[in-house]
Design a protein with these regions (language model features):
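Membrane-interface "cap" regions at the ends of multi-pass membrane proteins
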Residues: 1-43, 104, 306-318
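Flexible loop linkers connecting adjacent transmembrane helices
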Residues: 8-13, 47-49, 74-102, 129-144, ...
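Juxtamembrane transmembrane-helix boundary signature
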Residues: 34, 61-96, 109-123, 384
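Hydrophobic transmembrane alpha-helices that form the core helical bundles
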Residues: 102-175, 378-398, 436, 489
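Membrane-water interface regions at transmembrane-helix termini and the short interhelical loops
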Residues: 130, 170-175, 190-213, 219, ...
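Transmembrane alpha-helical segments of multi-pass small-molecule transport proteins
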Residues: 137-199, 215-222, 411-427, 451-460
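C-terminal membrane-solvent junction of multi-pass transporters and transport-like membrane proteins
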Residues: 203, 209-212, 395, 401, ...
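Hydrophobic alpha-helical segments and their helix-loop junctions in multi-pass secondary transporters
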Residues: 215-257, 262, 272-281, 454-468, ...
Length: 502
């Protein structure tokens, strides 16, 4: 084979980046998967409760929290594009303590975080089981449970609206039905289905599922907000939005300081630690790095790299728009539906409470629509996080020496682990028998504490690894990157302090 033939063979998979709108849209995808995995337990539960607690006044912070982490996300993607290196291998190159020929300090913290992410997945699976039981109980016990919980939550709502009826509703308020086996049966069925889909499915299927689910919960969210606008007592006014965008802080929330409330809200939204690591893997599978080609510092390679990094940025910012819209919507639902009557339901009853509040105004069909939207949100997180984490775990295990550390083996074990992951989550849900919100919280704490570490890595990638001048970001981008990292440090250290000494 001649040298020219070898060169052509090496570059046969490269592709010039698209410039037309249709071409760009065709090559988007990784960000939609990330959007689907983000808008789950955090946005549905924590953001809605934050809106209920603070009212409209923290809306500005919710928006900033969604936007600001994208700069770190893009730096992770940029590094992968330049060096064709997976994120875990890149993180293992960050200076610091390291086991000889093995994993460094970042990967050890990641290992702890990942163990708790599986627990979180178990909690989300339980929440999905509860949502399914609401609309389709499988046993008579489930039907009775739904009726008793409906009676109890309606009593809670009426008492919140008019405390004088508390005595009349005493019996209903004291109802405490045992959870039916329907929840576990639904969880088992969903875990088995997800395991099969993930094991046999490839990137195309995962992207398709994420697109359908993201589209589903986005449409449902629009419907929910539109219905609220038809009722004067629930409608969101211009004054409400103006207050939410005034950069103010609440005086106190149930005795909690405004700083505490603001930091808590900032920490639960936008791209989390797990998603920051997962994103470049989806970029690799979409082909961004392959289309760019192996680095040779030629003018052609630099041109392709610059163009595909542009596509990556568009993808990241598009996904940000999707999950920011959904996050804002859930925050407004909390501020409007719960905040105005000062009702703070238990996290495990949040979906049921919101669904019940729609019934007197819009009828039973409104509850079913809301619960379907909640299911789409929760299942997208469960399914897509399992798909993403399997790729990260396979790569990480190779660096720890548990698996052979090469690309072929990584891809093979990614598929195997993706099939096992939902079953592990199911086992933890059934074995631990904890409330879903408790299981979700455990993982959330470690992910927030991981953010400063990833901030350090992003700065290392930017200033030590982005050595091609044509591919370096602008000065303005660098400013926002530092702001992003500063925010991640603030929330990470605040969370550690709050949990240890708060």
């Amino acid at each position: 084979m001649s040298s020219e033939e070898k060169k052509n063979e090496q570059t046969s998979e490269t592709m010039e980046p698209p410039k037309s709108v249709s071409g760009i849209i065709k090559h988007l995808g990784p960000g939609i998967i990330i959007a689907g995995s983000i808008v789950g337990s955090g946005e549905l539960v924590a953001t809605t409760l934050a809106g209920a607690q603070a009212g409209f006044i923290l809306l500005w912070l919710i928006i900033i929290g969604c936007i600001i982490k994208v700069f770190v996300q893009v730096e992770f993607g940029r590094h992968t594009m330049i060096w064709s290196k997976t994120p875990m291998k890149a993180l293992n190159d960050v200076p610091g303590p390291k086991v000889k020929n093995g994993a460094n300090w970042i990967l050890w913290f990641w290992l702890v975080m990942t163990c708790l992410v599986v627990v979180q997945q178990g909690g989300i699976l339980g929440a999905i089981g509860e949502a399914c039981t609401m609309v389709q109980p499988l046993t008579e016990q489930g039907d009775v449970y739904n009726k008793e919980m409906s009676t109890k939550i309606n009593a809670i709502i009426k008492t919140a609206q008019d405390p004088s009826v508390a005595e009349v509703n005493k019996d209903a308020l004291n109802l405490n039905p045992d959870k039916p086996k329907d929840i576990k049966l639904w969880a088992i069925g969903i875990a088995l289905l997800s395991s099969a889909l993930l094991f046999y499915g490839k990137f195309g299927l995962i992207q398709w599922v994420s697109t359908v689910l993201v589209f589903g919960f986005t449409v449902i969210t629009i419907i929910n907000l539109a219905m609220l606008q038809t009722k004067p007592e629930w409608a969101i006014s211009f004054a409400d939005l103006k207050r939410g965008l005034s950069f103010g802080l609440p005086e106190s929330i149930g005795g909690v300081s405004s700083l505490h409330a603001a930091m808590a809200a900032f920490g639960i939204i936008g791209v989390g630690a797990a998603e920051l690591i997962q994103y470049p893997y989806w970029c690799l599978e979409k082909g961004y790095s392959k289309f760019t080609g192996k680095r040779d510092d030629s003018s052609g390679w630099k041109s392709r790299a610059k163009g595909w990094i542009r596509i990556l940025k568009i993808d990241a910012w598009t996904s940000m728009c999707v999950y920011t819209f959904s996050t804002i919507a859930f925050y407004l639902l909390g501020a409007t539906v719960l905040g105005r009557i000062k009702l703070m339901p238990e996290q495990n009853n949040l979906v049921r409470t919101l669904g019940e509040m729609y019934v007197p105004v819009f009828g039973d069909w409104a509850q079913e629509i809301f619960v379907f939207g909640a299911f789409a949100v929760l299942y997208s997180t469960f399914f897509l996080a399992a798909a993403g984490m399997s790729r990260v775990v396979a790569d990480g295990f190779g660096l720890f020496g548990f698996l052979k550390n090469d690309e072929e083996n990584r891809m093979k074990w990614s598929r195997i682990i993706s099939g096992i992951w939902p079953l592990m989550a199911l086992g933890l849900f059934l074995f631990l028998n904890k409330a879903p919100s408790t299981m979700i919280l455990w993982s959330g704490i470690t992910q927030v504490m991981m953010l400063p570490i990833l901030g350090v890595a992003a700065l290392y990638f930017r200033y030590k690894c982005t050595d091609v001048e044509e591919l370096q970001p602008t000065k303005a981008w660098d400013v926002f990157l530092w702001i992003s990292v500063s925010g991640m440090f603030a929330i990470g250290f605040w969370t550690a302090y709050d949990k240890l000494f708060g």
